[in-house]
Amino acid sequence: MIIPSIDLIEGNIVRLYQGNYDTKTFYQNNIYDIALKYYNQGAKIVHLVDLDGALCPNNKQTSLIKNLLNYFNFHIQVGGGIRSYKDVETLLLNGAKRVVIGSSAINNITEVEKWLLEFGYKSIVLALDVYVRNNGYKEVVINGWKNRSNVSLESVLERFSTLGIKYVLCTDVKKDGTCLGPNFTLYKNISKLFKNVCFQLSGGIGTISDVISAKKSGIKDIIIGRALLENKFSLLEAIRC
């Protein structure tokens, strides 16, 4: 499934380059128009990211996210700055199809395990942003990609897979926002290790050829952001290829 992504800072659509907030690009698209465009082109679910909240939970774009969830009648998964049971509950009550949990899965892992059991695996997406070192070690980065965790991707997946986690959004930070092609080796390796997990590929998709290769690699879901915003190809083309 192709999942279009919309990242927001102060109500504006943006894209970061390799997760760096200092290299953000603003787009003039109206968020309501672009989300509706994706839906009309066949999106089954839209990935919405509150980058203000990801960087600082106290700055979450709460009102905007709520308005978007109330406005649209299609499925949306929401991430960015989700740090508490109340955050998860509120988003689901406001209409989010899934809630994306990132930094909290590292900083407060026991609490997140409770959320998974409480709200169910269909409502939670585990978001693991990784920095792949030269030696191949895959370290999870947190807090808006600002901090390293000293925790490996595999160790987090191992723990949550025993609890029945279904959806995992995995981003290679060095590929994010580049449109230079995904790290297919990363996704092939983790898909083989954790066969019961539905991985969402994120980072690097820039051409239709990338989409075709991603589909052939066995990844269930493919998240695309910048390439769609810059009209490198349409969502409809990505779905049909």
Swiss-Prot record:
<keyword id="KW-0028">Amino-acid biosynthesis</keyword>
<comment type="pathway">
    <text>Amino-acid biosynthesis; L-histidine biosynthesis; L-histidine from 5-phospho-alpha-D-ribose 1-diphosphate: step 4/9.</text>
</comment>
<dbReference type="InterPro" id="IPR023016">
    <property type="entry name" value="Isoase_HisA-like_bact"/>
</dbReference>
<dbReference type="InterPro" id="IPR006063">
    <property type="entry name" value="HisA_bact_arch"/>
</dbReference>
<dbReference type="GO" id="GO:0005737">
    <property type="term" value="C:cytoplasm"/>
</dbReference>
<dbReference type="InterPro" id="IPR011060">
    <property type="entry name" value="RibuloseP-bd_barrel"/>
</dbReference>
<keyword id="KW-0963">Cytoplasm</keyword>
<dbReference type="GO" id="GO:0000162">
    <property type="term" value="P:L-tryptophan biosynthetic process"/>
</dbReference>
<keyword id="KW-0413">Isomerase</keyword>
<dbReference type="GO" id="GO:0003949">
    <property type="term" value="F:1-(5-phosphoribosyl)-5-[(5-phosphoribosylamino)methylideneamino]imidazole-4-carboxamide isomerase activity"/>
</dbReference>
<dbReference type="InterPro" id="IPR044524">
    <property type="entry name" value="Isoase_HisA-like"/>
</dbReference>
<dbReference type="InterPro" id="IPR013785">
    <property type="entry name" value="Aldolase_TIM"/>
</dbReference>
<dbReference type="GO" id="GO:0000105">
    <property type="term" value="P:L-histidine biosynthetic process"/>
</dbReference>
<feature type="active site" description="Proton donor">
    <location>
        <position position="129"/>
    </location>
</feature>
<keyword id="KW-0368">Histidine biosynthesis</keyword>
<comment type="similarity">
    <text>Belongs to the HisA/HisF family.</text>
</comment>
<dbReference type="InterPro" id="IPR006062">
    <property type="entry name" value="His_biosynth"/>
</dbReference>
<protein>
    <recommendedName>
        <fullName>1-(5-phosphoribosyl)-5-[(5-phosphoribosylamino)methylideneamino] imidazole-4-carboxamide isomerase</fullName>
        <ecNumber>5.3.1.16</ecNumber>
    </recommendedName>
</protein>
<dbReference type="Pfam" id="PF00977">
    <property type="entry name" value="His_biosynth"/>
</dbReference>
<feature type="active site" description="Proton acceptor">
    <location>
        <position position="7"/>
    </location>
</feature>
